[in-house]
Regions:
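Short aromatic/basic micro-patch
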Residues: 10, 53
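Extracellular beta-strand/beta-solenoid scaffold signature
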Residues: 1-4, 19, 23-52, 61-68, ...
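Consensus "Asn ladder" position of solenoid repeat domains
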Residues: 13-14, 57, 77, 112, ...
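Ankyrin repeat (ANK) tandem alpha-helical domains that serve as protein-protein interaction scaffolds
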Residues: 11, 75, 106-111, 135-137, ...
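Ankyrin-repeat and related helical/solenoid repeat scaffolds used for protein-protein interactions
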Residues: 166-209
Length: 222
């Protein structure tokens, strides 16, 4: 994997455990509101960020998100047991990895190992009118763990969900462990928007996909 530009900040070789562990009251199964919780590795949105690499980190036991930010490369990280409290109380934002979109560079998520009790393994959302560069999700191992059947979840669980108005390119390929019995991948863009390039090639069940793309490759559903 490579990054663009002449320099990059690197977040690497960290171990983050037991992040933001607040215990719910006895018999409290009410969902937390979206955004209540924390992230183990976090960078806020901003155009002043350098092109950052996040690699070889371990995140284990986190209330909400393991890795969150507008990073250029997230590579070879292990993220386990995120959404830890969501086995009892789901929030609207319990992802193992949350992708904050940027218009400055394409974002690559490669070779990560994910196990989460949360809603999604990878997720991204923006309601801005910006046209984002692109997302690559490649060669990751994912496991959206089962939860207690007695707990009601009012949100859609999926391995990957990307929801934004405009993005030039999405490539989701060669990821292992994705769901085959439920909608594993859901991509939402503006109606009528034409992407440059779109590809999904995994053994998984595909849900929503963009309406139009100049070039579509390997859209499989098995």
């Amino acid at each position: 994997p490579t990054v663009s530009g002449k320099y990059a900040d690197v977040i690497e070789n960290n171990v983050c455990k037991n992040i933001g562990f607040g215990k719910p009251s006895v018999n409290d199964t009410n969902a937390l509101t979206s955004g209540v919780g924390c992230a183990a590795i976090f960078a806020g949105m901003g155009t002043s960020l350098p092109n950052t690499i996040v690699k070889n980190n371990v995140v284990q036991n986190c209330v909400e998100t393991g890795i969150e930010g507008p990073y250029e490369l997230v590579y070879h990280n292990t993220v386990k047991n995120t959404g830890e409290n969501s086995v009892a109380r789901y929030t609207g934002s319990t992802e193992a990895i949350y992708i904050k979109l940027t218009t400055e560079f394409e974002q690559k998520y490669i070779g990560n190992t994910i196990e989460t009790r949360g809603l999604r393994c990878f997720s991204s959302y923006s309601n801005r009118d910006d046209e984002y560069k692109g997302i690559y999700i490649l060669n990751n191992s994912v496991n959206l763990e089962n939860t207690d059947a007695s707990i009601t979840c009012n949100y859609t669980r999926s391995d990957i969900e990307i929801n934004c108005k405009k993005i030039k390119k999405i490539v989701i390929e060669n990821n292992a462990g994705m769901m085959k019995d439920k909608k594993s991948v859901n991509i939402y863009t503006d109606k009528g928007y034409v992407m440059d390039y779109f590809s999904i090639h995994n053994p998984c069940m595909i849900g929503s996909v963009p309406e139009k793309a100049r070039y579509c490759f390997n859209i499989n559903n098995n």
